[in-house]
Amino acid sequence: MSIATTIVKNTPIFGRMFAVAKSTGLEEINAWPALMIMSSFVWLVVAGLLGLVMPATQIFDLSSDHFYTTLTLHGAALTFPFSFQLMMGVGLHRSGGCVGKAITGWLPALTWLTMNLGAAILTVAVLMGLKVSVIVMFPLPLVGAQMGVWSMESVIVGFTGIYLVLFCMIFCYPLLVLK
């Protein structure tokens, strides 16, 4: 049993939805893509809950700071770990199934880890005060740090998370498809 199968199997609720069948002999093709797809739906639930919190911050007249924190967390969770990871998992599942090559080894593990670790690090940066809109990028991260809107540490932590996600998508994923 692979590490990916074990993680999927031991995950409450989602583990049963994305269970990897070992009896078919396709575990090597399905395990890592199933873990990536399952992880993307976990992030979707997180993003959905944050999406419900956004109007609540306005209804209860909380600080606009809370609204922008929630907005940034919601956008980052939908963009990076949900959308990118879902595309990656489905793509690897199809490429493994069509070509018949196993998706095993250190590269799929690195891909899954960098995607989720990068998203978690970006989440920490937002909680540290980085509140950049994913779409508009206003104010620019360095300008916001120079103006005192957020700290330079949150910018560094945020870009570290974004770097890990982009490394996963630009470098690791194409290597997995070509492998």
Regions found by a protein language model. Give the residues of each.
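Hydrophobic alpha-helical transmembrane segments of multi-pass integral membrane proteins
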Residues: M1-K179
